[in-house]
């Protein structure tokens, strides 16, 4: 049984103030084709180098099947991945969501989208990446209990992404965080994370300039991403509605009104560096299937 082609979006987690709680999908998609086979097989094209059946797509598929009480049968998977690896754009979450979504499809939809989120979030541990990959757009998410609520999606905006040529592994970025934070810093972030849904609901996008500010993670990780704090301020000065590090970094994301991306791109060029790249992307949809 051949399945339709599966598309799973890249994502940005944290959005500055919403550490481990807020995320957004981008219109850049991991593409996956799969069908049952005599033995597992994995064919990969795209960013980085991934091989073997011990990969995140197969891992997600096996977890999804077992969550349904089913024994996973062998699956031949072909993946094309344009999402940069270890850059803070949710490549791992996209792969895990793809695998769990394959299990859901092959079981006749027994997990449902909520079940796909629950299983994938349990594997990934970062619901702020998994939730937008499942539901699309902006999402607020919890891991315990697993819960995700989509937020209003603004029209006429684009993300400018400055993607440096180096990686920041998530475990290294986690190690940079303090185990305790001052109460005033916690309050600072709580207040600003609440501004995200308020600004998106009301259409007052100018409030995102303050909503994206953070004291809990970006300052502590800045030494892993030289010039990142200055680049965030530069993007805001150039007219960005919001600017923040994508996930654990090093990608820097700036939200701009459509047609006003050029000065933001220029402001981020030094941070990106001559060997890095700039992507301009819209807000993405949650995973979907398309007949080939």
UniProtKB/Swiss-Prot annotation:
GO biological process, one term: threonine biosynthetic process
Source taxon at top rank: Bacteria
Enzyme class of the recorded protein, top EC level: transferase
Gene3D superfamilies: 3.30.230.10, GHMP kinase, C-terminal domain (3.30.70.890)
PROSITE patterns (alphabetical): GHMP_KINASES_ATP (PS00627)
Pathway recorded for this protein: Amino-acid biosynthesis; L-threonine biosynthesis; L-threonine from L-aspartate: step 4/5
SUPFAM superfamilies: GHMP Kinase, C-terminal domain (SSF55060), Ribosomal protein S5 domain 2-like (SSF54211)
Location within or outside the cell: Cytoplasm
Catalytic activity: L-homoserine + ATP = O-phospho-L-homoserine + ADP + H(+)
The keyword Kinase appears for this protein: yes
EC number in record: 2.7.1.39
Gene Ontology CC terms, in alphabetical order: cytoplasm
Any one GO MF annotation of this record: ATP binding
Positions contributing to ATP binding: 84-94
This protein's UniProt keywords: Amino-acid biosynthesis, ATP-binding, Cytoplasm, Kinase, Nucleotide-binding, Threonine biosynthesis, Transferase
Main location: cytoplasm
Protein family: Belongs to the GHMP kinase family. Homoserine kinase subfamily.
Function: Catalyzes the ATP-dependent phosphorylation of L-homoserine to L-homoserine phosphate.
Name listed for the protein in its UniProt record: Homoserine kinase
Species, as recorded: Thermus thermophilus (strain ATCC 27634 / DSM 579 / HB8)
Lineage, top ranks: Bacteria, Thermotogati, Deinococcota, Deinococci, Thermales
Gene that encodes the chain: thrB
């Amino acid at each position: 049984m051949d399945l339709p082609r599966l598309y799973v979006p890249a994502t940005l987690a944290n959005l500055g103030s919403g550490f481990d709680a807020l995320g957004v999908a981008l219109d850049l998609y991991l593409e996956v084709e799969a069908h049952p086979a005599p033995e597992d097989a994995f064919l990969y094209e795209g960013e980085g180098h991934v091989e073997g059946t011990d990969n995140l797509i197969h891992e997600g598929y096996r977890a999804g099947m077992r969550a349904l009480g089913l024994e996973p049968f062998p699956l031949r998977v072909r993946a094309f991945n344009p999402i940069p690896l270890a850059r803070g754009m949710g490549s791992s979450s996209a792969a895990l969501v793809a695998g769990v979504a394959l299990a859901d499809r092959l079981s006749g939809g027994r997990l449902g989208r909520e079940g796909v989120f629950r299983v994938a979030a349990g594997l990934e541990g970062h619901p702020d990446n998994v939730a937008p990959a499942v539901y699309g757009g902006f999402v607020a998410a919890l891991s315990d209990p697993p819960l995700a609520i989509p937020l209003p999606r603004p029209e006429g905006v684009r993300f400018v992404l400055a993607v440096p040529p180096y990686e920041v592994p998530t475990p290294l970025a986690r190690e940079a965080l303090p185990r305790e934070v001052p109460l005033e810093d916690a309050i600072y972030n709580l207040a600003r994370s609440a501004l995200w849904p308020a600004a998106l609901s009301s259409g007052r996008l100018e409030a995102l300039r303050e909503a994206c500010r953070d004291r809990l993670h970006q300052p502590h990780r800045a030494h892993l991403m030289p010039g990142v704090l200055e680049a965030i301020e530069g993007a805001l000065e150039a007219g960005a509605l919001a600017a923040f590090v994508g996930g654990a970094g090093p990608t820097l994301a700036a939200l701009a009104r459509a047609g006003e991306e050029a000065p933001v791109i220029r402001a981020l060029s030094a941070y990106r560096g001559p060997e890095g790249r700039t992507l301009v992307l819209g807000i993405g949809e949650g995973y979907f299937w398309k007949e080939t």
